């Protein structure tokens, strides 16, 4: 394990390089930071850090820059995530509370995360597996066509137009609505699917064909894998850091167009409140080896509904970015859990 002073030197190198994008020299470090030692001692510490692979010397400079390994140690030794200001927290809460439905929550979340971090933001649509059915509404469009609206406790709204076998009046529609809500309301999705499949066999024969059609549509909505969708924002932010990517920017943009890559980056964040950081090759995506990915899960309490995070250069403000990701995830979880 590195001694504490060398860790402080590494921390100072990372912080200065993130701010300036210029290789950092020992004299500059000694002048800018209260390290309590001479430039010569700092120079010796930097030599030791370089030998152990935490920093490296670009060909064109006498200064040093962090390596993947150096960034990793810096992140692992963070004493805490930098808290957002009260104004920032209030702005996040106000912006997200303006959402009108679940799709709007996702759209606002991904835009907000991109703006706060100035990186590429990715938000996974929530999984229904931990959700419950809040209400099912049926509206008559004409005697042979109904509109079915399924609402979950996380705010997801699914609408389906349903053609039924024979004409129905408002009284029958009311009965069908009552049967569906009486059987499914409040049930977790994983339980509701089984109940819905068996429901038509429990009603009188004249309602059975209509209820069979409706429960088939309900099952399709409940079983749809919404969590395989992601929202993306802020790809233009990568151009601000194009110098960090050398010749790899095009490959990064191409990788971010692949849904499976995005899901791989953030879908593994399976805990709320815990922020994960993957640096360089830790992303396991060759095109993203010059990036870092910061992600967390969001949801209702400990139940994770999805993941969110950002993709940016390794030279990023890790404490600030981690704080923003955690804060947005926290407020999204609270919003989805609100009645």
Curated annotation (Swiss-Prot):
One of its GO terms (molecular function) is DNA binding. HAMAP family: HrcA. The keyword Repressor applies. InterPro entries: DeoR_HTH, GAF-like_dom_sf, HrcA, HrcA_C, WH-like_DNA-bd_sf, WH_DNA-bd_sf, WHTH_transcript_rep_HrcA_IDD. Belongs to the HrcA family. This is Heat-inducible transcription repressor HrcA. Keywords: Repressor, Stress response, Transcription, Transcription regulation. It comes from the Bacteria. It holds the Pfam family HrcA. Negative regulator of class I heat shock genes (grpE-dnaK-dnaJ and groELS operons). Prevents heat-shock induction of these operons. One of its GO terms (biological process) is negative regulation of DNA-templated transcription. The keyword Secreted does not apply.
């Amino acid at each position: 394990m590195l001694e504490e002073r060398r860790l402080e030197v590494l921390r100072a190198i990372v912080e200065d390089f993130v701010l300036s994008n210029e290789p950092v020299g020992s004299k500059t470090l000694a002048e800018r930071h209260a390290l309590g030692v001479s430039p010569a001692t700092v120079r010796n510490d930097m030599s030791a850090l370089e030998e152990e692979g935490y920093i490296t010397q670009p060909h064109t400079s006498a200064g040093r820059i962090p390596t993947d390994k150096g960034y990793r140690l810096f992140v692992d030794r963070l004493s805490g995530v930098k808290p957002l200001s009260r104004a920032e927290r209030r702005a996040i809460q106000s912006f997200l509370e303006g959402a009108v439905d679940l799709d709007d929550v996702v759209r606002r979340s991904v835009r907000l995360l991109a703006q706060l971090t100035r990186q590429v933001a990715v938000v996974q649509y929530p999984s229904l597996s931990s959700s419950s059915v809040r209400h099912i509404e049926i509206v008559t469009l004409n005697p042979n066509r109904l509109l079915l609206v399924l609402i979950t406790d996380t705010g997801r709204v699914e609408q389906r137009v349903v053609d039924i076998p024979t004409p129905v009046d408002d009284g029958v529609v009311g009965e069908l609505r009552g049967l569906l809500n009486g059987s499914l309301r409040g049930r977790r999705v994983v339980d509701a699917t089984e109940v819905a499949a068996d429901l038509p066999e429990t009603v009188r024969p004249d309602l059975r064909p209509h209820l069979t059609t409706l429960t088939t549509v309900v099952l399709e909505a409940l079983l749809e894998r919404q969590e395989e969708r992601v929202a993306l924002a802020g790809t233009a932010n990568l151009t601000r850091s194009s110098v960090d990517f050398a010749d790899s920017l095009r490959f990064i943009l191409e990788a971010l167009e692949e849904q499976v890559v995005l899901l791989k980056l953030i879908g593994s964040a399976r805990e709320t409140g815990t922020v994960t950081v993957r640096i360089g090759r830790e992303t396991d995506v060759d095109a993203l080896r010059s990036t870092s990915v910061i992600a967390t899960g969001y949801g209702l309490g400990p139940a994770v509904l999805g993941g969110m995070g950002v993709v940016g250069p390794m030279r990023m403000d890790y404490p600030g970015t981690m704080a923003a990701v955690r804060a947005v995830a926290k407020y999204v979880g609270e919003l989805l859990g609100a009645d």
